[in-house]
Curated annotation (Swiss-Prot), chains A, B:
HAMAP family per record: Pro_tRNA_synth_type3 (MF_01571)
Free-text comment on this protein's domains from its UniProt entry: Consists of three domains: the N-terminal catalytic domain, the anticodon-binding domain and the C-terminal extension.
Organism: Saccharolobus solfataricus (strain ATCC 35092 / DSM 1617 / JCM 11322 / P2)
Swiss-Prot/TrEMBL catalytic activity: tRNA(Pro) + L-proline + ATP = L-prolyl-tRNA(Pro) + AMP + diphosphate
Gene Ontology CC, one term: cytoplasm
One Gene Ontology term of the molecular function aspect: ATP binding
Coiled coil regions, renumbered to chain: none
Subunit structure: Homodimer.
Keywords: Aminoacyl-tRNA synthetase, ATP-binding, Cytoplasm, Ligase, Nucleotide-binding, Protein biosynthesis
Function of the protein: Catalyzes the attachment of proline to tRNA(Pro) in a two-step reaction: proline is first activated by ATP to form Pro-AMP and then transferred to the acceptor end of tRNA(Pro).
Protein name per the record: Proline--tRNA ligase
Length: 481, 481
């Protein structure tokens, strides 16, 4: 079968809406509040599997899950002044309880630094308790005035994993930043999402952070999308909330903090990145159903029933071996209609089982990613499927990385950079002297957004694309979500 | 060791606050918004285990998990008039986004009937899709004006499992009510929470329901607490939202719905019900840590280290056998201090491992519930612990049921009933003619709350405690949370 990526790349926005709706992942645009969608059962399971992976990586590195209230009083949110400035125009406010006006406005959490630091101030007294790493997975709210998009730009972000850590020293917090980056790399690798890691420029840091490191991926339409951020908060929040701990030397001081987040966009990326014109291809690591069995009707009813029985038997065999399998037993749909449905749900492997397979005791296997097919004996099916699931997982990751890398170009000519970005072809790296002035000028001239610069040292034997001084590194620019 | 239940029964409220704080389950009263608490890591794990049990029972009976937006527009919430009347004074309203006044006020969901029915109206068209059973586990909000209590009466209920089902006929919905009741019985049995099941009287139904069935348990102070409700909604919401489906006979009609909920109170009950003056006793089915190992220091450092090594080895053996175990390796606390800590965390089994156990290759086991102790050889430890965990689980359930049953009294004398309730001794059943008038009079005269009447037929050869007509059933009354 021919694999095309026309709709997927040329009309990604329509493709994505179509997949979310027809694949029954997420109902968007019909709930009567702008920017808020509904996770349908199939999408919810995908989301749960992704959350499961995030939880495993965090739990196994000493992070402890907690759950804080949704609401933050206005006076508390205002304690860190840069922070509130960054969020002020995006906060939803609760002002009434029943018919009573509240004395203090309550914010729907846009993020939880101040809420969590408030309680850390009560819980943590000594360096002996550090490092401390909390996280929660919650809804956060942003009163977005830009155009909203399902899973990508929402007013209710329903899957915000936010980690918050506390350390004795600046360097300890920096080490935590590095650990967080390593954890995120593993999470995105497991999710088969390729990424570019950059330090965000000074003018685009998280409100209240000393440093912001960000993971961006490239979506099918060539736009970059931020999928994870890691912030070194220094003592900004501990000072604002007067949170001190006893240090090793006996003195009292403000601890250093970090925070890092991953959102619904992780789910959006998993659905989008490996897609084709048939729909998404879900990586086996998170696919809610790994194998779907489509029984192919025979010429007579009796044989059709035997095929169904054989199909169910095969499927049970997979489930017993922890390979989540479902047999589509609908008798009103044709096999072709079922192929369409399960392709748009992105199930990685399909089995087609008809009279031929029944008689020969075989199964006919089709991979969703490249539509290659295999026929194996029933007894060999478990091993073959396990092998194919591993292959699919690796192939998806490898191809997505190749695709991402092919979309990063270097240019020392600002006009050429602008032209590349105009073609929606991903990320352009331009040589940069390191000054904010030149950085902002680059954004202005390309009408694009600066993602930042590599965190590792980058040798650039070139001149800054703006001021023509010696370049210290490259600045990455892209059209973004 | 002597087991006392003085603090637990006489000053339950203080006992509960003490356990939540010292056991590090839930930080309450210190977050700067009334009625909103913080789930700390240990409490969060307990909550997750309880949610896991709820999910298993729902998933295995064809319920599908979804996630709806937190906010409900005012006009939508007003569509079912009885419903909004019931909740109107308890709703938190979002009225501003940034500095902009919103055109339509948005409610923080108090419950989700109207939100979910709105989308069901788009998703469900035919009887062939029915029955449909959705559920979500979310925060709901009530602007409580009564005194709030941790986990029991909150302004943010963070663990609201709400199921919503759709059926072709009234009878199908009634069957679903029965299924829901059976599921809840299994959930509460697994959680070792005893209950009384009643149909709530007409004047205390869920706002918008035709029938409300409720599970109440009795807390240590003798007050009844509602821990689960099941509602037959009839066509009230489908009519209000103009939600029709095609029936088997081809006609279009409003489907019948049910909804049922369990909240944070399930966690509160698990912590409260089996407690004693040392703290709670968590049932093994949900305890985050099933076995804690306390190494007992020896006279010299070398032997102490060997004890520690042996302790860790034992603990790893349990973990490998899926018995969650933790060794308390803190070298600054005495064994006695550790006993105190892990008792207040309710860990069902403690091992004390010292030089004697090291030399003899044994483990010393102590049950948290009755403080009985056992010494077994290391090789027998796994089996012994498994056996004890089962015994503890069964003993907790059995004793809690005995305790509950001993707190239900029958009285055909309203003055005596009032006196019993004044002593906080649980639930009183009084003979009742079935009229609302007499029911309300009973509430008034006893200064207590009517829980309702048994759902099964109850033979009562007695006269109504108010009107002296022949009693049709009993009415249950209690001081309640």
């Amino acid at each position: 079968m021919q694999i095309t990526r026309e709709k997927w790349s040329k009309n990604f926005s329509e493709w994505f809406d179509w997949v979310l709706r027809e694949g029954e992942f997420y109902d968007y645009g019909r709930y009567p509040i702008k920017g808020m969608g509904v996770w349908m059962p199939y999408g919810f399971k995908l989301r749960q599997n992704i959350i499961g992976i995030i939880r495993n990586f965090l739990d196994s590195t000493g992070h402890e899950e907690v759950l804080f209230p949704l609401l933050i009083p206005e006076d508390l949110l205002r304690r860190e002044s840069t922070h509130i400035k960054g969020f002020e125009e995006e906060v939803f406010w609760v002002t009434k309880g029943g018919s009573t006006d509240l004395d203090v406005k309550l914010a729907l959490r846009p993020t939880s630094e101040v809420a969590i630091t408030t309680m850390e101030n009560l819980w943590l007294k000594s360096y002996k308790q550090l490092p401390k790493k909390y996280y929660q997975i919650v809804s956060v709210f942003r009163y977005e005035t830009k155009a909203t998009r399902p899973m990508i730009r929402l007013r209710e972000i329903t899957t915000f994993k936010e980690a918050h850590t506390v350390h004795e020293t600046y360097d300890d917090a920096q080490k935590q930043v590095e650990e967080a980056i390593e954890i995120y790399k593993k999470i995105f690798d497991t999710l088969t999402i390729p990424y570019v890691l950059s330090e965000r420029p000074e003018w685009d840091r998280f409100a209240g952070a000393l440093h912001t490191y960000a993971f961006d991926t490239i979506m099918p339409d060539g736009r970059a999308m931020q999928i994870g951020t890691v912030h070194h908060l220094g003592q900004n929040f501990s000072k604002a909330l007067d949170f001190k701990i006893q240090k090793k030397d006996g003195s009292l001081d403000y601890p250093h903090q970090t925070s890092y987040g991953i959102s619904d966009r992780a789910v959006a990326s998993v659905i989008a990145i490996h897609g084709d014109d048939h729909g998404p291809v879900l990586p086996p690591s998170v696919a809610p159903i790994k194998v779907v069995v489509i029984p192919i009707p025979a010429k007579n009813e009796e044989e059709t029933q035997q095929v169904m029985k054989y199909s169910i038997e095969i499927c049970e065999m997979f489930n017993k071996n922890n390979i989540t399998c479902l047999t589509d037993q609908d008798t009103e749909k044709t096999p072709g209609e079922k192929f369409y449905i399960w392709e748009i749900k992105g199930v990685p492997i399909r089995l087609e089982i008809g009279p031929r397979e029944l008689i020969s005791g075989t199964v006919f296997i089709k991979r969703r990613d490249n539509f290659k097919s295999y026929t194996v004996r029933k007894e060999e099916a478990i091993n073959k499927i396990k092998e194919l699931l591993n292959e699919i997982q690796e192939d998806l990751r490898r191809k997505a990385w190749e695709d991402l890398k092919s979309r990063i170009e270097y240019s020392n000519d600002i006009e050429k950079a602008k032209k590349i970005l105009g073609n929606n072809s991903g990320i352009v790296e331009v040589p940069w002297c390191g000054s904010n002035e030149c950085g902002l000028k680059i954004e202005e001239l390309t009408n694009a957004r600066v993602l930042g610069y590599p965190i590792e040292k980058r040798e650039v034997n070139d001149k800054c694309v703006i001021c023509k001084m010696n370049a210290k590194t490259v600045l990455r620019i892209a059209k973004t979500y």
